């Protein structure tokens, strides 16, 4: 079994051009209701990257890009799209062959003007003599959509060669002051940039979550509300070296007025690859789902850390041998390669989508698929879980790696989270229903090659 390169993170659509025009926000503007509503129309928009390739064709370019499909009352509006790259008007930098613009993407209304902004990481960007230093670009939302950009300055410790600044991003109001903040991985450490942000490049205070002194190296982030205090909490995936031995760990950081404070941590036998936060038992506390696809010779598991008022405590483990879960345990399936939480059927309980991108089906190697677990009063259950096969995106084939990334978000405001699934060179948007996400009326997102918004 092989692992899809496209899945290592987190269109043949007509792309509208970007303009460098900045629209002034009204003085009374508040933070956008949805962190991914770039034009302020009340509907969530979908952004996805193809960071290791450019637009197809002889006159194309390389260096990575992010595509945006704007939302509407009927779902994604494929006639209203946009593409952002470093050669777009108003976007800093220049697209270069080994750039990974879109390696990570996140969003929030960073300048509090009522429009969500797109944050794009490019961890391989060369800056001056600093090779692979990396950059983070904020592309500003407006009434007409995304327009113009500002580069975020890294601090010492994430500004040298091989820092890969921007390799992972996460947003949230971590100190509860009403201004969205931004967490960035650079130099194998996590940096917290406090809001508000301005188009001239200023931010609030910047602090380092310094665990390198304890042998900790960060490689993944997930943000959400765990302990019910209203502040956003942060989950960091990484490796800690103890007595020169690596240990795979997940670290929960509690949101606080001072920023982020130390919380619980958990050690795993294999590397944590993905994480999502959702209230699977509807008790008011967010549960942390961690995907560990390499566990047990690549059969994979998902570990769910239960949320409480004091943070995560106790856990349950799920795999393809769990009661009611479709499929069977097979080496190399990579169950848990991607995870995302959302209420797909509108019952008030968060559900969990789990990508199984290297699942073999009927002799087709690495065909892939997605399992959707149902939330309930007792938390996640395999009972009533559903399997979404690769054939919803196209004919059965090998090496499609369907499920390499997954994302659950309600884009049409019907109270049910819609499912977007990535594969090798393609992605599919499916509507949530009272039973399970459906391929009826689905939307293809070709030119995909990277990840989705968190």
Which residues fall in each region the model found?
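Hydrophobic strand positions within the blades of repeat-based beta-sheet folds
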Residues: 46-48, 66-69, 84, 101, ...
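Short glycine/acidic-enriched loop and turn motifs that connect beta-strands
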Residues: 51-58, 124-129, 189, 239-244, ...
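Beta-propeller blade termini
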Residues: 30-44, 49, 102-115, 166-174, ...
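Blade-edge motifs of beta-propeller repeat domains
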Residues: 2-31, 70-100, 138-164, 194-216, ...
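Beta-propeller domains
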Residues: 185-186, 191, 211-312, 317-328, ...
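Beta-rich catalytic cores
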Residues: 42, 62, 97-101, 106, ...
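Acidic/hydrophobic-patterned starts of short beta strands in beta-sheet-rich repeat architectures
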Residues: 40-49, 112-122, 176-185, 228-237, ...
């Amino acid at each position: 079994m092989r692992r899809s390169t496209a899945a290592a993170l987190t269109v043949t659509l007509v792309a509208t051009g970007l303009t460098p025009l900045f629209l002034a926000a009204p003085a009374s503007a508040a933070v956008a209701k949805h962190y991914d509503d770039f034009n302020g129309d009340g509907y969530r928009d979908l952004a996805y990257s193809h960071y290791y390739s450019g637009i197809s064709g002889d006159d194309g370019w390389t260096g990575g890009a992010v595509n945006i499909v704007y939302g509407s009352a009927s779902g994604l509006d494929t006639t209203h799209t946009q593409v952002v790259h470093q050669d777009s008007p108003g976007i800093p930098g220049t697209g270069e062959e080994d750039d990974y613009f879109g390696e990570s993407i996140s969003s929030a209304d960073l300048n509090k003007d009522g429009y969500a902004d797109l944050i794009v990481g490019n961890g391989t960007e060369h800056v001056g003599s600093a090779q692979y230093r990396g950059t983070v670009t904020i592309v500003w939302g407006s009434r007409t959509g995304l327009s113009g950009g500002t580069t975020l300055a890294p601090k010492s410790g994430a500004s040298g060669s091989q820092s890969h600044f921007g390799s992972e991003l996460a947003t949230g109001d971590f100190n509860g002051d009403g201004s969205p903040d931004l967490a960035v991985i650079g130099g194998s450490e996590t940096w917290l940039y406090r809001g508000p942000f301005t188009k001239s490049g200023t931010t609030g205070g910047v602090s380092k979550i310094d665990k390198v002194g304890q042998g900790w190296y960060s490689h993944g982030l997930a943000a959400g509300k765990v302990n019910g205090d209203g502040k956003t909490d942060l989950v960091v995936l990484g490796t800690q070296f103890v007595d020169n031995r690596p240990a795979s760990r997940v670290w929960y950081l509690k949101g606080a007025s001072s920023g982020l404070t130390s919380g619980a941590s958990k050690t795993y036998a294999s590397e944590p690859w993905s994480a999502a936060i959702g209230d699977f038992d509807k008790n008011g506390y967010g549960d942390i789902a961690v995907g560990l696809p390499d566990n047990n010779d690549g059969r994979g598991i998902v570990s769910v850390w239960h949320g409480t008022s004091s943070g995560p405590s106790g856990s349950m483990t799920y795999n393809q041998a769990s009661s009611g879960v479709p499929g069977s345990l097979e080496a190399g399936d990579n169950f848990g390669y991607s995870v995302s939480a959302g209420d797909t059927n509108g019952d008030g309980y968060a559900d969990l989508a789990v990508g199984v991108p290297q699942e073999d089906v009927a002799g087709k190697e690495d065909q892939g698929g997605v399992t959707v677990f149902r939330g309930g009063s007792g938390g996640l259950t395999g009972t009533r879980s559903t399997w979404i096969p690769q054939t919803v995106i196209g004919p059965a084939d090998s090496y499609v790696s369907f499920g390499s990334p997954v994302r659950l978000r309600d884009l049409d405001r019907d109270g049910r989270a819609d499912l977007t699934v990535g594969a090798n060179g393609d992605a599919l948007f499916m509507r949530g229903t009272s039973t399970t996400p459906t391929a009826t009326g689905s939307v293809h997102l070709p030119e995909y090659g990277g990840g989705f918004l968190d």
